[in-house]
């Protein structure tokens, strides 16, 4: 780690404390994040963990070197919701072909959407259907060790059997007892379960449903439960390539550094992942640090289709933003709206709940417009290294304090420190070189406008406002409007300070 980079500290849901991050192997830093179930358009709540952990991925690459960080984000392409969508959308196709159409088209849309949000591609994106062998092998190991059992062609994991053994306890992540978890959980009641809290590792496929050879001596075809998929895929991508896995008896080699996802996944999904992986691999921890982002609301309400406020990422990208006018290049429009959405989300710390509003999205687009305008005016070039991003890096090293990082970007803009602004934006995934260099983007088509002169007149107007000389402040506003420049006043949500932006009109 470079001496100029502060110690990275991350909040660990497992310990409920902010911890200094110490990778198991600084040359092989490894992170796993639960990805999408590809049956429908991803909504803006799905976008939040993608953005949050992309920022962490960028920060880890900055600190340890891009070649030393592996980021795995899975794709769930085996699920009852996928089956239902396939039957609905393609009733005339053979079922497996219909499922393939749903998963391939939905995944392609997801990849396009999250790319528009400014995210890097993860190092690997394993698909559940590609790792059935690992799932079966892990299930067989769990049965052999007495923490899973076969019943009516199902294989189930027994939390009570896990807790009867020496080693990690079920419930350590959620910090709840089995009775407390049962009281607050929605569990499937089934006669073949020994205990209500037992959960499915494998289940038989019905006629016509996709199915694979089953583990544990079961003769019928079946398919995996949701939780075992992530345990198997993280093992395949973050343990086995580095000497871990089912053939390894070294507990440290069977752990990776960071596991992330939304707060809604703490229980049961992540709790069950830990149980499966620890019991199968003989380790105390599946991952050393568990990170979870907070919930998202829309205009102060829970997002739901029944309330009519269900917003997909594609909705945000398609709506565009007024700065681009009638710009016909959909890719460019997507990327501009995506960057604005990214900045909007990063203005709330990842562990806090976020309130998505159209106003904040528009304000974020305005702020990006100002930042890019300065970079263009000063001829900023895409940086090869981020040697001037220290203030942003320091903020992000404090448990991804994105608000403090954005404050650093605002300060760099205020003092016209172009290197700090541009490199800091790059570290946060807010820099698209196209918007810095392209000459044909309507948002920056201001050849006849002197941005520096306008900034000076805005500063003069603010001085008049502070002196309560309203007549002179209005005079400057009206003169600029006559010249085709419209001013817009707003307030910094954190400081209350007046912010004035401008745009060309007429």
UniProtKB/Swiss-Prot annotation:
E.C. no:
6.1.1.16
Task: Keywords in alphabetical order, please.
Answer: Aminoacyl-tRNA synthetase, ATP-binding, Cytoplasm, Ligase, Metal-binding, Nucleotide-binding, Protein biosynthesis, Zinc
What InterPro entries does this protein's entry cite? Cys-tRNA-ligase, Cys-tRNA/MSH_ligase, Rossmann-like_a/b/a_fold, tRNA-synt_1_cat_dom, tRNAsynth_Ia_anticodon-bd
Question: The motif 'HIGH' region: which residues?
Answer: 36-46
Which sites bind ATP? 305
Q: How is the cofactor bound?
A: Binds 1 zinc ion per subunit.
Q: Which GO terms describe its molecular function?
A: ATP binding; cysteine-tRNA ligase activity; zinc ion binding
Record-annotated residues binding Zn(2+)?
34, 230, 269, 273
Main location group: cytoplasm
Q: Does the keyword Coiled coil apply?
A: no
Which chemical reaction does it catalyze? tRNA(Cys) + L-cysteine + ATP = L-cysteinyl-tRNA(Cys) + AMP + diphosphate
Q: Does the keyword Kinase apply?
A: no
Q: Where in the cell is it found?
A: Cytoplasm
Motif window: 'KMSKS' region: 302-306
The family database entries (Gene3D superfamilies) matched by this protein are listed as: Cysteine-tRNA ligase, C-terminal anti-codon recognition domain, HUPs
Please cite one Gene Ontology biological process associated with this protein.
cysteinyl-tRNA aminoacylation
Q: Family per UniProt?
A: Belongs to the class-I aminoacyl-tRNA synthetase family.
Q: How does it assemble?
A: Monomer.
Per its record, how is this protein called by name?
A: Cysteine--tRNA ligase
The species is Brucella abortus (strain 2308)
Source organism lineage? Bacteria, Pseudomonadati, Pseudomonadota, Alphaproteobacteria, Hyphomicrobiales
Gene behind this chain?
cysS
